[in-house]
Amino acid sequence: MKFKADEISSIIKERIENFDLNLEIEETGKIISVADGVAKVYGLKNIMAGEMVEFENGDKGMALNLEESSVGIVILGKGEGLKEGASVKRLKKLLKVPVGEALIGRVVNALGEPIDAKGVINANEYRFVEEKAKGIMARKSVHEPLHTGIKAIDALVPIGRGQRELIIGDRQTGKTTVAVDTIISQRGQGVICIYVAIGQKQSTVAQVVKRLEEHGAMEYTIVVNAGASDPAALQYLAPYTGVTMGEFFRDNAKHALIVYDDLSKHAVAYREMSLILRRPPGREAYPGDVFYLHSRLLERASKLNDELGAGSLTALPIIETQAGDVSAYIPTNVISITDGQIFLETDLFNSGIRPAINVGLSVSRVGGAAQIKATKQVSGTLRLDLAQYRELQAFAQFASDLDEASRKQLERGQRMVELLKQPPYSPLSVEKQVVLIFAGTKGFLDDIAVSRIEEFEDGIYPFIEAKHPDIFEQIRSKKALDSDLEEKLAKAINEFKANHL
């Protein structure tokens, strides 16, 4: 059998044309040194800042320091079995985490991987952890209320959707309780909540999750946990992972709330990482860009304009102070970034005033525009009344005889302080808050003993629900008090006092 030369050449030509060279070029480097969750790697010449790499043991890493002859890489895992000379592979991509509805009700780590033994998460979308915050034109001013269910906050330091409100105070003053109460209060409000635990004890996080489950709040909540035993790199990443998940809901015309518990530990984790990477330390040994660390995180919370769907992402960062020192580095940084702060005090907490909110130091810079009219009407003078009461209280310790007006003011103040107390994990609806604060500010409680205020509160809600259900209904629908409604409310309160107290 003879072959023609041109046939052979055409077959060879066809083979050459159809030849598929499946070569994947991998860029690898070698570990020079590894210690404390950071690896120094030689040989990754073309690596980008923030790029992901893979180690021999399967752990992922992130390039943070690009130096002349080496790369500083933080290990996003335990780093077990890594030694000098081991190879490191470039992944040529930035860190992405899963986002979407599939995460709701789950507990995940800082990489978005499930840690609640409820099986895999089938996410349809992944997003970059580091995203630029929305610009001015994409935003709208805060104008819708986000009710926390806590009387003292909703009346005096109201929070709006899209706001950043700092919760600040010493350890054991009830900061997490305020945040968890706010999450529980979002039930039925169409708000997706994200709780980010940074550097917390696993037992504490388990307790929070249990509390949320008890109140049915896990149905609309995602928990991101980077515990105290996790590497500093994962503690550093956790808030960014949480906010990326929150942004998904905001960008899809929904409302989300994110709690960072707490950013003091976040800054400590970042300081630890930076010092190991041999970056120059600044004030309190924090690196120079610790302000940017938090500002770029908190700027991602926003209220979007109508063209973009009018979604919102509200942030409640928590900061722990040492002995009430608000002028330390991290507290002042975060105070200047946020739109107000709720200041919790140890002395108030220990004296039984809980939530231990210092009304004088707490402020909401943009929430006033979001407060409903009914709350504004009843709590308009409340802040001033409480401030005058505190002043008089200090004065009354020295003066024995007080005039009638001062005595009345003192007594009204005592009742208002008692009125604003609230047990944990029992958020109140807006209409109930309006009724109670109306009773206090309009003087209906002046003739009730301070010790019986709690009894009054426990009884008035079921009484109105049973005898005057239209009052709550009207406050809900009108969101304001007119003269008829005020009259009805006054009548109902007097009727309750006459029959039940």
Curated annotation (Swiss-Prot):
<feature type="site" description="Required for activity">
    <location>
        <position position="362"/>
    </location>
</feature>
<keyword id="KW-0406">Ion transport</keyword>
<comment type="subunit">
    <text>F-type ATPases have 2 components, CF(1) - the catalytic core - and CF(0) - the membrane proton channel. CF(1) has five subunits: alpha(3), beta(3), gamma(1), delta(1), epsilon(1). CF(0) has three main subunits: a(1), b(2) and c(9-12). The alpha and beta chains form an alternating ring which encloses part of the gamma chain. CF(1) is attached to CF(0) by a central stalk formed by the gamma and epsilon chains, while a peripheral stalk is formed by the delta and b chains.</text>
</comment>
<comment type="function">
    <text>Produces ATP from ADP in the presence of a proton gradient across the membrane. The alpha chain is a regulatory subunit.</text>
</comment>
<dbReference type="GO" id="GO:0045259">
    <property type="term" value="C:proton-transporting ATP synthase complex"/>
</dbReference>
<dbReference type="InterPro" id="IPR000194">
    <property type="entry name" value="ATPase_F1/V1/A1_a/bsu_nucl-bd"/>
</dbReference>
<dbReference type="GO" id="GO:0046933">
    <property type="term" value="F:proton-transporting ATP synthase activity, rotational mechanism"/>
</dbReference>
<dbReference type="InterPro" id="IPR000793">
    <property type="entry name" value="ATP_synth_asu_C"/>
</dbReference>
<dbReference type="Pfam" id="PF00306">
    <property type="entry name" value="ATP-synt_ab_C"/>
</dbReference>
<keyword id="KW-0547">Nucleotide-binding</keyword>
<keyword id="KW-0375">Hydrogen ion transport</keyword>
<keyword id="KW-0472">Membrane</keyword>
<keyword id="KW-0813">Transport</keyword>
<dbReference type="InterPro" id="IPR020003">
    <property type="entry name" value="ATPase_a/bsu_AS"/>
</dbReference>
<feature type="binding site">
    <location>
        <begin position="169"/>
        <end position="176"/>
    </location>
    <ligand>
        <name>ATP</name>
    </ligand>
</feature>
<keyword id="KW-0997">Cell inner membrane</keyword>
<dbReference type="GO" id="GO:0005524">
    <property type="term" value="F:ATP binding"/>
</dbReference>
<dbReference type="Pfam" id="PF00006">
    <property type="entry name" value="ATP-synt_ab"/>
</dbReference>
<dbReference type="InterPro" id="IPR027417">
    <property type="entry name" value="P-loop_NTPase"/>
</dbReference>
<comment type="similarity">
    <text>Belongs to the ATPase alpha/beta chains family.</text>
</comment>
<dbReference type="GO" id="GO:0043531">
    <property type="term" value="F:ADP binding"/>
</dbReference>
<keyword id="KW-0066">ATP synthesis</keyword>
<keyword id="KW-0067">ATP-binding</keyword>
<dbReference type="GO" id="GO:0005886">
    <property type="term" value="C:plasma membrane"/>
</dbReference>
<dbReference type="InterPro" id="IPR023366">
    <property type="entry name" value="ATP_synth_asu-like_sf"/>
</dbReference>
<dbReference type="InterPro" id="IPR038376">
    <property type="entry name" value="ATP_synth_asu_C_sf"/>
</dbReference>
<dbReference type="InterPro" id="IPR005294">
    <property type="entry name" value="ATP_synth_F1_asu"/>
</dbReference>
<dbReference type="Pfam" id="PF02874">
    <property type="entry name" value="ATP-synt_ab_N"/>
</dbReference>
<keyword id="KW-1278">Translocase</keyword>
<dbReference type="InterPro" id="IPR033732">
    <property type="entry name" value="ATP_synth_F1_a_nt-bd_dom"/>
</dbReference>
<dbReference type="InterPro" id="IPR004100">
    <property type="entry name" value="ATPase_F1/V1/A1_a/bsu_N"/>
</dbReference>
<keyword id="KW-0139">CF(1)</keyword>
<protein>
    <recommendedName>
        <fullName>ATP synthase subunit alpha</fullName>
        <ecNumber>7.1.2.2</ecNumber>
    </recommendedName>
</protein>
<dbReference type="InterPro" id="IPR036121">
    <property type="entry name" value="ATPase_F1/V1/A1_a/bsu_N_sf"/>
</dbReference>
<keyword id="KW-1003">Cell membrane</keyword>
